[in-house]
């Protein structure tokens, strides 16, 4: 009779023989809000989550599209509110303390470590050294940590520096894309089973392909494969006053965010987030368009209608919805997942939910 395979012995032997081996699943347990409910939902499938620890997230876009606003501002602020220590790596020499404080970031040494470095090798050495010390700590003493790199596109290779010093700028011959890929690949493997995450920004350039008009992310495609979440951003002008009325002056930007890659929701979904210069972003920005696009908010004349799960009808003008009057958008978020799940269920599986579906789509008689 054949001897049965001993899984527990195999698990114990392989754990001893391979240093740093992680066994089992490492699903994210800690999520950090982007500061915007609609973007949180498109990234993670939950309005209150956002980007996870243990993974690498990339915000890529043109200059002034709001990458640093989200990565170095909102996400850092949300992380600190959850007791997560932040290591902020500034490769652009552009993050001023006054600007970070204006966004609500705590710049004290106990909450934030800001590093200014420009070499890819230096960033890799910093992350590697940190993780060695981190793994040496007992399980109960390991803090939650978030690395923010702003940005990948501005980092240099030793070849860049040597050529600059010699006055012979030939280019790095493809070394930078390979170095960035290696950086992200190693980071993903190091962070996987720990409460340590990374958020990066990167630059984009216009596509020359008429059949693929989406902006291209600089630095090659290798690090995109290793990233769990990639958000592409474009900058549009915001010509609205505080009441939402159209004006000719530019009062801010509209950040067009498209989730190019995510492992937690549907990819290629997009939302426009308004970021006024004076007041900053409203966390509910883009939520009305998201709910309307899924059919949960329906037009009735010049107003928008929503039927809650407890059969309460909410009928308001668009501006009232955008201002979240009477907590109307909070009610939409509360019922969003429940109603969307019913609407997307195959017909043969919704016998018990037919009444709910009819109520969601019911139009009042005139």
List the predicted regions and their residue ranges:
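Phosphate-binding/switch loop-helix module in NTP-utilizing enzymes
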Residues: 118-195
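Catalytic P-loop NTPase motifs of RecA-like helicase/translocase cores
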Residues: 95, 155-156, 207-208
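C-terminal regions of RecA-like/P-loop NTPase motor modules
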Residues: 1-22, 32, 238-366
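Phosphate-binding/switch region of NTP-binding enzymes
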Residues: 173-294
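Hydrophobic "anchor" residues on beta-strands that sit immediately upstream
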Residues: 86, 146, 198
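A short alpha->loop->secondary-structure connector
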Residues: 81, 103-110, 163-173, 215-220
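The Walker A/P-loop phosphate-binding site
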Residues: 2-110, 125-132
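A glycine-rich helix N-cap at a beta->alpha junction
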Residues: 108-121, 227
């Amino acid at each position: 009779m054949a001897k049965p395979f001993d899984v527990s012995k195999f698990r114990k032997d392989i754990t001893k023989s391979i240093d740093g081996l992680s066994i089992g699943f490492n699903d994210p347990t800690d999520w950090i809000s982007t500061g915007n409910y609609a973007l949180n939902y498109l990234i993670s499938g939950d309005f209150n989550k956002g980007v996870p620890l243990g993974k690498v997230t990339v915000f890529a876009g043109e200059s002034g599209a709001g990458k640093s606003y989200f990565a170095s501002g909102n996400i850092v602020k949300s992380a600190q509110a959850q007791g997560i220590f932040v290591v902020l790596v500034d490769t652009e020499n552009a993050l001023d303390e006054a600007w970070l404080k204006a966004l609500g970031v705590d710049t004290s040494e106990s909450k934030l470590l800001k590093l200014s470095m420009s070499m890819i090798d230096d960033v890799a050495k910093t992350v590697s050294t940190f993780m060695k010390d981190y793994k040496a700590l007992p399980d109960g003493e390991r803090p939650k940590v978030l690395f923010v790199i702003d940005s990948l596109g501005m980092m240099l290779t030793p070849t860049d520096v040597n050529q600059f010093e010699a006055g012979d700028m030939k280019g790095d011959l493809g070394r930078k894309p390979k170095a960035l890929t290696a950086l992200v690949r190693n980071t993903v493997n190091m962070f996987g089973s720990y409460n340590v995450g990374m958020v990066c920004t990167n630059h984009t350039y216009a596509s020359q392909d008429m059949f693929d008009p989406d902006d291209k992310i600089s630095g090659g495609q290798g690090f995109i494969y290793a990233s769990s979440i990639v958000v592409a951003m474009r900058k549009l002008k915001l010509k609205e006053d505080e009441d939402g009325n159209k004006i000719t002056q530019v009062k801010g930007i509209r950040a067009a965010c498209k989730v190019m890659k995510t492992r937690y929701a549907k990819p290629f979904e997009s939302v426009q987030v308004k970021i006024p210069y004076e007041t900053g972003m409203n966390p509910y920005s883009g939520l009305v368009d998201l709910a309307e696009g899924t059919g949960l908010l329906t037009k009735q004349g010049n107003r928008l209608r929503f039927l809650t799960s407890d059969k309460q009808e909410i009928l308001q003008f668009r501006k009232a919805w955008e201002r979240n009057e009477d907590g109307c958008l909070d009610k939409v978020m509360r019922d969003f997942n429940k109603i969307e799940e019913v609407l997307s269920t195959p017909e043969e599986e919704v016998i018990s939910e037919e009444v709910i579906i009819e109520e969601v789509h019911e139009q009042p008689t005139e």
